[in-house]
A protein has these predicted regions:
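Sec-dependent bacterial lipoprotein signal peptides
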Residues: 1-18
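A Zn2+-metalloprotease active-site environment signal
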Residues: 18-271
Length: 271
């Protein structure tokens, strides 16, 4: 009888955790409250900043550019969400953009809006439009709860049939932070997240839209990924690509969604 009740509770918990994303339309399995996830993200982000060199935007053109592009992407996101009457989903986001001195060709966005770009990415992004498409991609991972999905899948796999009791018992312990660390990476691996294929393609599609709404040509997304893939053929492939889908599939999907993104594109003057 107890086993049957536990089974019912587990099924109920899973049902509650399943929701449909109001933008992508995809069903998602997310166990964690967004506010709790954002708190963990802030703690990890602050720890990261204390152990890495932040490039000041007060006297560095690259840092100024990263901040400028980041703000335009964030403004585009807010405009899109307002247009679709779902701006309330952005409550709790505290956006912040930092450029980190590192040879890694990487970028990421934490749940809650903490965006980091590494200086090693800039030679590949080459221009503001290329950077905007990278940042739009990473922001999409945060907006669509991809880290929450990764953590929820990890929790389900780790605890199996006792998912409800074990999850509730460990959500405030160090075990939960370990799961968070496994989902987002820690230390030098922060931001190297093994998102699934659907998650990556979602981020590509909407990253182009955010970039277009911010005034950057979404066509540059295709040019960017071609440069990324060319670099990946060398001895030091970008960390950014370490968990991403194959180049042919990615370019094919970018080309498929380019007309959609172009509908949002209004070029800026004097970029």
């Amino acid at each position: 009888m107890i086993r049957k009740l536990l089974f019912v509770f587990v099924i109920a918990a899973i049902a509650i955790a399943c929701s449909t994303n109001r933008i992508t339309g995809r069903s998602q399995f997310k166990l964690l409250p967004e506010a709790e996830l954002q708190q963990m993200a802030v703690a990890e982000y602050q720890s990261f900043l204390t152990s890495n060199k932040v490039v000041s935007s007060s006297n560095n053109r690259d840092a100024e550019m990263v901040n400028r592009v980041g703000q335009r992407i964030v403004n585009a996101v807010y405009n899109y969400y307002r247009q679709n009457n779902i701006a309330n989903e952005l409550e709790g986001y505290q956006w912040e953009t930092k450029l980190i001195q590192s040879d890694q060709a990487n970028a990421w966005c934490m749940p809650g809006g903490k965006i980091v770009v590494y200086t090693g990415l800039l030679p590949i992004s080459q221009n503001e439009a290329g950077l905007a498409n990278v940042m739009g991609h990473e922001v999409s991972h945060a907006l669509f709860g991809h880290t929450n999905e990764r953590m929820s899948q990890s929790i389900a796999a780790q605890y199996g049939g006792s998912i409800l009791d074990a999850f509730m018992a460990n959500r405030t312990s160090s075990g939960m932070r370990q799961i968070f660390g496994a989902a987002v990476g820690v230390g030098s691996q922060l931001g190297i997240m093994a998102f699934g294929r659907n998650q990556e393609l979602e981020a590509d599609r909407y990253g182009m839209i955010w970039a277009a709404m911010a005034g950057y040509n979404p066509q540059e997304a295709i040019n960017l990924w071609n440069r990324m893939n060319a670099k990946a053929q060398g001895n030091n492939p970008p960390e950014f690509l370490s968990t991403h889908p194959g180049p042919e599939r990615r370019i094919e999907q970018l080309q498929k969604h380019l007309p959609e993104a172009m509908k949002y594109y209004k070029p800026m003057s004097n970029k």
